[in-house]
Curated annotation (Swiss-Prot):
CDD domains according to UniProt: trimeric_dUTPase
Pfam families associated with the record: DCD
Protein's organism: Methylococcus capsulatus (strain ATCC 33009 / NCIMB 11132 / Bath)
Keyword Hydrolase found: yes
Full protein name: dCTP deaminase
Binding annotation for dCTP: 111-116, 135-137, 156, 170, 180
Record-stated family: Belongs to the dCTP deaminase family.
Classification of source organism: Bacteria, Pseudomonadati, Pseudomonadota, Gammaproteobacteria, Methylococcales
EC number: 3.5.4.13
Gene behind this protein: dcd
């Protein structure tokens, strides 16, 4: 598997709608200030976080069970900023909608700007022929509240081209997160 370049990313986004909306270059400045960068980089694409958040709370003293997740464990927030409580986490989604080609697998890594503040961004790989908004998981590993900025960069997607096309894609097996929009909670 080889990593795909900025030229390939731009071509696939423009000709095949692989990323929508798409920013063909790296954006580092907003209207009046600097932003955490997003858009096409040399060998990846830096995604933005939308303004839709689900902040984890334990007001119901629930047990976290991935097979039976209680959605009442979250507080919904629509805002340009999300404050994650100490030692807690929040879910969000990307601004961008992805359509992954059949011969590509992506790996997503959190941006160092957040990691250096103790904020870990986790995203599972985007599998061949998966499509949707990416659900982002933010973990605040610090004993202090942590801030996430909507519409700014949060993670980088790396596109790995396969040497051989897979027999069964995510779409073929009707993956449970296929076509997801909005912030999607765990499904068992």
């Amino acid at each position: 598997m080889g990593i795909k370049s900025d030229r390939w990313i731009r071509k696939m986004a423009r000709e095949h709608g692989m990323i929508e909306p798409f920013e063909p270059h790296q954006v580092r400045h907003g209207d009046c200030s600097s932003v955490i960068s997003y858009g096409t980089s040399s060998y990846g694409y830096d995604v933005r976080c939308s303004n839709e958040f689900k902040i984890f709370t334990n007001i119901n003293s629930a047990i976290v069970d991935p097979k039976n997740f209680d959605q009442n464990s979250f507080v919904d927030l629509v805002s340009d900023v999300c404050i994650i409580p100490p030692n807690s986490f929040a879910l969000a989604r990307t601004v961008e909608y992805f359509r992954i080609p059949r011969d590509v697998l992506t790996i997503c890594l959190g941006k160092s700007t957040y990691a250096r503040c103790g904020i870990i961004v986790n995203v599972t790989p985007l599998e061949p022929e998966w499509e949707g908004h990416v659900t982002l998981e933010f973990s605040n590993t610090t004993p202090l509240p942590a801030k996430i900025y909507a519409n700014e960069g949060v993670a980088q997607v790396l596109f790995l081209g396969a040497d051989d096309v897979c027999e069964t894609s995510y779409r073929d097996r009707s993956g449970k997160y296929q076509g997801q929009t909005g912030v999607t909670l765990p499904k068992a």
